[in-house]
């Protein structure tokens, strides 16, 4: 509004302008009325202790929507001197896009690093065509209505499993809590607008932790589990199983798209339902995911924090040394199998989406370790003493 027709607007603002969902309307307005000539993403540190900045030049002209502006990225460098040197050398990463290309992306984010191949998948075959949000349950008094599962008897119908997000862990686990599910408690939740819709009770789903400072990780939700707002959950519209989507979202390709769709530390249901879905080699993927679930469930159930823990693994031998050797071998086998499966899933989805050279199939060992742990003498001895 401050610029005449064919005039230029040159500004430096916080980088959140390019990505935050709350500024979608502003980005759409710019897409409809302007073209971007140049953009320099300065990242953190250009102006001291800032929150990240971008400098840009817009021109108010509506007749050149296909004009491809230039985007420079200086975010990898920290100091002002390094940024200046990199900018003047013109050796920083450079990308070219027209603003109207961003209309295809959820929230119209200016995700300028996205390749043309990735752009092709947005705007069609969204996950929302087959999946729906399950809402959330809110007790309005967690201190009263929630317990860690080992604090209550496992034969009580009053308490049922409750999802509350948790640490990074793929496929299965993070089952710590139970919620009071008595009729009186449910009436209280409902009276405050917190009771989740009964049509979602008793169904398997796909869940994850809403907030993460690392990567999103998706897990199987058992049918008996209810879930809170920090453990968003989606279901197929016919409530059937769909391990293909879990495999896709947990893959490197899944992470590639989610980083475009979600630009904050919180991954909400709407963003996940905007995920572009391409199905290929479905049975092969399903078999791999089923095996991953079994591997990670065995890992989770080997520790006392699991509701299905039966016996400490160091008791399963003639001697403690023999038991530990066997346990160490089992853990190593599970770890290597999960790592192999996850890499194969990455390769399948990279091929399915045509993202060779853009997405890496390699699997980070610390990610596998979070879901299928190696034996660790110090930790396992402490656990054994605690169990005793």
Give residue spans per PLM region:
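N-proximal short alpha-helices
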Residues: 214, 218, 257-258, 318-322, ...
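Non-catalytic DNA-recognition/assembly elements of restriction-modification systems
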Residues: 107-115, 119-122, 141-142, 276-388
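Short secondary-structure junctions and interdomain/linker hinges
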Residues: 37, 125-133, 152-157, 166-170, ...
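Long, contiguous hydrophobic alpha-helical segments, chiefly transmembrane helices and signal peptides
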Residues: 39, 55, 146, 179-181, ...
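Signature of N6-adenine DNA methyltransferases within the class I
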Residues: 1-155, 174, 184-194, 203, ...
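DNA target-recognition domains and sequence-specific DNA-contacting regions of bacterial/archaeal
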Residues: 136-223, 232-237, 360-388
């Amino acid at each position: 509004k401050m610029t005449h027709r064919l005039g230029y607007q040159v500004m430096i603002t916080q980088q959140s302008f390019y990505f935050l969902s709350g500024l979608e309307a502003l980005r759409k307005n710019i897409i409809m009325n302007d073209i971007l000539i140049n953009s320099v993403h300065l990242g953190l540190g250009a102006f001291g202790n800032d929150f990240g900045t971008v400098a840009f030049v817009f021109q108010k002209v509506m007749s050149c929507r296909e004009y491809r502006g230039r985007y420079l990225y200086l975010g990898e460098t920290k100091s002002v001197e390094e940024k200046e040197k990199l900018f003047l050398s013109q050796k920083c990463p450079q990308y070219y896009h027209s603003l109207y290309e961003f209309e295809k992306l959820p929230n119209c984010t200016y995700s300028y690093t996205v390749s043309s191949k990735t752009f092709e998948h947005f705007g069609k075959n969204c996950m929302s065509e087959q999946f729906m949000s399950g809402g959330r349950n809110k007790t309005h008094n967690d201190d009263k209505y929630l317990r860690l599962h080992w604090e209550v008897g496992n034969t009580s119908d009053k308490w049922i499993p409750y999802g509350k997000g948790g640490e990074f862990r793929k496929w299965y686990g993070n089952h710590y809590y139970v919620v009071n599910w008595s009729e009186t408690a449910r009436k209280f939740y409902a009276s405050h607008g917190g009771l989740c819709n009964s049509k979602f009770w008793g169904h398997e789903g796909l869940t994850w932790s809403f907030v993460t400072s690392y990567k999103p990780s998706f897990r199987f939700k058992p049918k008996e589990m209810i879930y809170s707002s920090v453990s968003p959950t989606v279901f197929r519209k016919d409530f059937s199983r769909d391990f293909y989507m879990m495999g896709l979202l947990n893959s490197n390709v899944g992470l590639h798209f989610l980083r475009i769709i979600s630009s904050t530390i919180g991954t909400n249901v709407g963003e996940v339902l905007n995920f572009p879905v391409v199905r290929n080699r479905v049975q092969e993927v399903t078999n791999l995911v089923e095996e991953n679930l079994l591997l990670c469930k065995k890992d989770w159930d080997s520790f006392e924090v699991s509701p299905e823990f039966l016996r400490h693994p160091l008791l399963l031998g003639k001697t403690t040394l023999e038991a530990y050797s066997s346990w160490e071998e089992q853990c190593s086998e599970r770890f290597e199998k999960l790592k192999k499966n996850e890499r194969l899933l990455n390769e399948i989805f990279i091929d399915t989406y045509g993202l060779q050279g853009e997405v890496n199939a390699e699997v980070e060992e610390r990610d596998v370790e979070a879901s299928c742990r190696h034996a660790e003498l110090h930790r396992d001895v402490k656990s054994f003493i605690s169990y005793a």
